[in-house]
């Protein structure tokens, strides 16, 4: 079994729940260099706690009113573009850091890259399928769900 020395920990920057649980997890990991990859408010929290971070993710904004996502098709398109961009970003970081392990808290782009590069990876999630959209956009969303 290969020893893990370097771990890139990709934490979704959407909301603060991901980074909160990720900090609790990292506090229990010893003798491994951890580099967080995230953005937005999550990056600010990690920076204040003196974690090593790459603040590189800028997710699309979204508006929810009465439990309904506004502009669903537009948001889905923006999220798909964000995902493609995150794949490029995560591949660059993983290769530069020569990572031995990838931990992904709902960052599916880094997970895909890790699997393509045959790097051991761990997914942290509480979502098995999204249901943000209705109508024609839901067909695209279902296809994206299958790719996760």
PLM features: what roles do these ranges have?
Residues 2-8:
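Extreme N-terminal starter segment of soluble prokaryotic enzymes
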Residues 25-33, 45-46:
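A short, Lys/Arg-enriched amphipathic alpha-helix followed by its capping loop at the start of a domain
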Residues 71-101, 108-109:
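Conserved nucleotide-sugar donor-binding subdomain of glycosyltransferases
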Residues 44-45, 102-117:
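An aromatic- and histidine-rich active-site surface loop
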Residues 33-38, 101-104:
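Short, hydrophobic beta-strand segments that form beta-sheet elements in well-ordered domains
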Residues 10-23:
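A short, glycine/small-residue-rich beta-strand->loop->alpha-helix junction that serves as a flexible
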Residues 120-148:
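Active-site-proximal region of nucleotide-activated glycan assembly enzymes
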Residues 13, 35-83:
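Conserved nucleotide-sugar phosphate-binding/catalytic loop shared by glycosyltransferases and other
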């Amino acid at each position: 079994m290969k020893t893990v020395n370097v771990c890139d920990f990709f934490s979704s920057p959407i909301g603060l729940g991901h980074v909160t649980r990720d900090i609790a997890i990292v506090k229990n990991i010893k003798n491994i260099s951890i580099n967080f990859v995230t953005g937005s408010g999550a990056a600010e929290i990690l920076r204040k706690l003196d974690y090593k971070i790459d603040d590189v993710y800028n997710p699309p904004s979204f508006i929810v009113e009465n439990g309904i996502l506004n502009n669903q098709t537009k948001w889905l398109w923006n999220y798909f573009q964000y995902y493609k961009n995150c794949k490029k970003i995560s591949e660059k970081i993983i290769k530069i850091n020569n990572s031995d392990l990838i931990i992904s808290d709902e960052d599916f782009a880094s997970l895909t890259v890790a699997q393509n590069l045959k790097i051991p990876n761990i997914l942290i999630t509480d979502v098995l399928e999204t249901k943000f959209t209705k109508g024609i956009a839901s067909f695209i969303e279902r296809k994206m769900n299958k790719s996760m």
